[in-house]
Amino acid sequence: MTSMVEIQNEIERVTALAVKYISENKDSLVVFVGQIDYNGYDAGKLLSILKEKAKGRDFGRDLCYLLVMRYTRGTGFVRDVRKKIKVAAGADTAYEIVTHYGVVQSVGDNADAITLGRLAALFPYVSMNIVKSVSTGAKLALDTSDLGTSGLDILLWDFVPQFINLDSVDAPYCNKKNTSNILFSLHLLQGALTTRKTMPDQKKKKDNLTTDFDLLKYTAELLVITCSAKNLTDNKKSTYRKKLVEPFRENEDYKADFWTALGKLSTGCLKKMKKDAQNYLKDRTTVLKLMVDNCSGTDDEAAKAIKDYLTVDD
């Protein structure tokens, strides 16, 4: 069995390869974006499979291209790749990489399946660098329209929970005045709203996910599992968290528009939820409690309450 240290070391090795590729080939990745225009797993086993498949190849490069697919076209893109691309060069590149690694759209009955989502979660720092590198040259596949705010997209991608440190695996999950509290709160809301919009109605009924309360509870359970993963050391989580929020920081503090965005999230999203959902959120994190308590006020009042509560260390 692969040890946790071996898993962490292998992730760091491949991360270094991929980040190096990003720094040296950003233009190529952005071009590739244009050319393709139109959760519980065994990390050790998946890494072993990838390492074997990557023999004789530049896996850093391949990983970058796979993650570009993930964040510009979505996880379903790997199905019938050639039919979904308007530029031949992009079709050839994408098809060759997807086929070589055997990337599939969903796990299905294969516990060891390689999916774009699993790759994104396994190498979260690479994912973050991909999103930051191609965001100016592509429309990224993220829908935040139901949050009632804007400007927080980089914090809402599926790799971010890998950077979160929980204070407890039982509610409240985050009660410190730090960045993890903010990120967990954002992802609980984004995850529930995304599930509400994208999950077929028939499946929602079958799984009893027909109310905001049900969706939040479902999302929280999955999010806690994801945040509890030990693929990254706590030090790495902290380092990557700080890198993630750099665009929102100025002179050791968060910028004014960051607090404004959180205030709008409170008044534009939480205010619309029913009382049972609001009460559930109040017990998940201290930031969500503040947002619920101030959702009936103005954007500025909600933003001030959140800013006054939080500190700006980690």
From Swiss-Prot:
It comes from the Viruses. RNA binds at residues 38, 41, 118, 237, 266. Keywords: Acetylation, Capsid protein, Helical capsid protein, Host cytoplasm, RNA-binding, Viral nucleoprotein, Virion. The keyword Ribosomal protein does not apply. GO terms for cellular component: helical viral capsid; host cell cytoplasm; viral nucleocapsid. It is found in: Virion; Host cytoplasm. Its main location: virion. InterPro entries: Capsid_Phlebovir/Tenuivir, Nucleocapsid_Tenuivirus. Pfam families: Tenui_N. GO terms for molecular function: RNA binding. The N-terminus is involved in homooligomerization. This is Nucleoprotein. The lineage of its organism: Viruses, Riboviria, Orthornavirae, Negarnaviricota, Polyploviricotina.
